[in-house]
Amino acid sequence: MSKRQLCILGSTGSIGCSTLDVVRLHPERFQVISLAAYTSVDVIFEQCIEFKPQQVVLVSSEHAALLTQKLNDANVSNITVLSGEQALIDIAECQNSDTVMASIVGASGLLPTLAAVNAGKRVLLANKEALVTSGAIFMAAVKASGAELLPIDSEHNAIFQCLPSQQQAEIGECQLLANGISKILLTGSGGPFRTRAIDTLESVTPSQACAHPNWDMGRKISVDSATMMNKGLEFIEAKWLFNVEAEDIQVVLHPQSTIHSMVQYKDGSVIAQMGNPDMRTPIAHALSFPERIESGVAPLDFFNTPSFEFQPVDFERYPNLELAIEACKQGQAACTALNAANEIAVAAFLDEKIKFTDIYKINETSVKKFVSQKVDNINEVIALDEQARSFAQTLLADFLQTEALSQKGNK
């Protein structure tokens, strides 16, 4: 059996570490060729010692120098340490790997992920923002290069598993409605504030927002789950992965996070994929597809599983989700602007600069500003992303000034 040669973009994050957990179980199947992260020197150093990659990228040159020193001190001399955004792109497209785990968080993962696609590799897509930000442009690159795109998000991986094999082979060009499928049912837990009084949401703290009831995730995606913007981004991603319209996707609240998503067929059947909420399951599925391998995740224990609950979405509680669904209908500019603004707003909330409910205000205003802008190629995507971030930063400055004046007036 020939080993898959892996490049893991975002190796020190939640998805990256879970990927290496699966790889650790199957040394006969996988070889780690390259790792990439932003600044997590200590974590990636330990990964280097264990998995012995040929190349490592830390975007920060300062942190790359620290890693080089740590490797030298450990008498490790056969690992090349690189730095910079271009180095991320270089290792993503380098022909010494055939499979790329694209798990860099946010729009910064777009160009490295696109580079892996253009190189015609098997791309395991955990970076939903890359597809949300570039949509049809990204999928056109997949088609042109012959890359094999496999979804890692638990919901999209679940949908993929529920599809007929011929539709799995047509990712991005699926013809679901013509092949007996009537709807995609995209499930979401509702996050930690599903039952909290709406009028108290403005007082939510970052630590509360990051305390997801079911999943262990990074801080940014945890906040997105609390606002359900994460589900909104997944809604947009589902449109492109499965070639459907917004009207063909329905979001269903499922607090237990046991059913990861469902596909509804025209004959009344609904096929669901379920399991314990652990990202190693979809990662193992995509790494070994079309085979099945051990993931390290215990199978679902039906006798100790709570009864399944399903609820409609309350958009008053989750306005960010409604905004994302509308952006999906409005077009690429709205989606690109929404993602950019949300990254700025969430970072500001995590830094305790704005309130939880201000995230929506920044997002909504940004989408309205850029919804009509032309986006026909990757350069225009990048330009709009930069413009939307700058605009969101301006809005943020206005929020901070208003808050400062308010506090001054109360003294």
From Swiss-Prot:
Pfam family, one: DXP_redisom_C
GO process annotations (BP): isopentenyl diphosphate biosynthetic process, methylerythritol 4-phosphate pathway involved in terpenoid biosynthetic process
Residue positions binding NADPH: 12-15, 127, 129, 218
Cofactor(s) the protein requires to work: Mg(2+); Mn(2+)
Catalytic activity: 2-C-methyl-D-erythritol 4-phosphate + NADP(+) = 1-deoxy-D-xylulose 5-phosphate + NADPH + H(+)
Binding site for 1-deoxy-D-xylulose 5-phosphate: 128, 154-155, 189, 212, 225, 230-231, 234
A molecular-function term among this protein's GO annotations: NADPH binding
Keyword vocabulary terms for this entry: Isoprene biosynthesis, Manganese, Metal-binding, NADP, Oxidoreductase
EC number per UniProt: 1.1.1.267
Binding site residues for Mn(2+): 153, 155, 234
Pathway of action: Isoprenoid biosynthesis; isopentenyl diphosphate biosynthesis via DXP pathway; isopentenyl diphosphate from 1-deoxy-D-xylulose 5-phosphate: step 1/6
Homology family: Belongs to the DXR family.
Role description: Catalyzes the NADPH-dependent rearrangement and reduction of 1-deoxy-D-xylulose-5-phosphate (DXP) to 2-C-methyl-D-erythritol 4-phosphate (MEP).
Matching HAMAP family: DXP_reductoisom
Protein name, UniProt field: 1-deoxy-D-xylulose 5-phosphate reductoisomerase
